[in-house]
Amino acid sequence: MAFKEVVRVAVTGGKGQIAYNFLFALAHGDVFGVDRGVDLRIYDVPGTERALSGVRMELDDGAYPLLHRLRVTTSLNDAFDGIDAAFLIGAVPRGPGMERGDLLKQNGQIFSLQGAALNTAAKRDAKIFVVGNPVNTNCWIAMKHAPRLHRKNFHAMLRLDQNRMHSMLAHRAEVPLEEVSRVVIWGNHSAKQVPDFTQARISGKPAAEVIGDRDWLENILVHSVQNRGSAVIEARGKSSAASASRALAEAARSIFCPKSDEWFSSGVCSDHNPYGIPEDLIFGFPCRMLPSGDYEIIPGLPWEPFIRNKIQISLDEIAQEKASVSSL
């Protein structure tokens, strides 16, 4: 099969559930399109070789035409060698009784090593998508340990939050999903994220005007989006996997296969942002792709006092997380 190009891709956490779902979407063309081949490297920590071999067998058995090359590895340098894109999914999950600070430090060590390996082995313009939580801070740690790579190309995944809000607005307004646009998530991927309904449009009109229920928007919608991950865990006993995988595929596709004037939310480096957010943070902003192939943070969006206050709370949390891992 003739490809427009072959994309070298690394996926970490290869034996986990999010990666398991994501890998088949990747091989099917849901991430880079159906005209790009994929040179895929699947990584997980030493001791997972048998599980990785099973994942490889299933991908082989799928007979995916776009899967140009496939290998599994427990070496970060091998996984990241010459890559165009990395999806950093693997992370330590938060266990019973674990403090958030402990989680930050444990994952900080993981993403320090991954960032250093990216710095050594990846292409300088490689695009890095971080999924493992706490995702904003993990992304910042990886970025700081990979100074050779462009800071603008590090993304912390907020697309699942965006999708959750998108779906909730469509259900409330009783309209198809395609009628909802300009769904924006600011700040941290946590219970202090800021789902900004004031920017959203339903059938081209302001969502607040169409919904007509400010109390529902401020209290029910915002709270539901902020806490959806916990609600999923409580309901099914496991964290989101299939929906997270789909969100990751869409997040990458928005960058590699952009649609005209599509808005997407991503945690990106705050350097030179148009909203006065301090620099050297990974902060959620609304973005869109430019003809040059770069993205821009969409400028000039007004913040109502309700949204501004919540953005400050989310910003404070990100700054505190950064301070707690700066020694790494």
UniProtKB/Swiss-Prot annotation:
It comes from the Bacteria. GO terms for biological process: malate metabolic process; tricarboxylic acid cycle. SUPFAM superfamilies: LDH C-terminal domain-like, NAD(P)-binding Rossmann-fold domains. The active site is at H189 (proton acceptor). It catalyses: (S)-malate + NAD(+) = oxaloacetate + NADH + H(+). Its EC number is 1.1.1.37. Substrate binds at R94, R100, N133, R164. The keyword Metal-binding does not apply. NAD(+) binds at G13, G14, K15, G16, Q17, I18, A19, N107, Q114, V131, G132, N133. Gene3D superfamilies: Lactate dehydrogenase/glycoside hydrolase, family 4, C-terminal, NAD(P)-binding Rossmann-like Domain. One of its GO terms (molecular function) is L-malate dehydrogenase (NAD+) activity. It holds the Pfam family Ldh_1_N. Keywords: NAD, Oxidoreductase, Tricarboxylic acid cycle. NCBIfam families: MalateDH-SF1, PRK05442.1. Belongs to the LDH/MDH superfamily. MDH type 2 family. HAMAP family: Malate_dehydrog_2 (MF_01517). Catalyzes the reversible oxidation of malate to oxaloacetate. This is Malate dehydrogenase. It comes from Chlamydia pneumoniae. The gene is mdh.
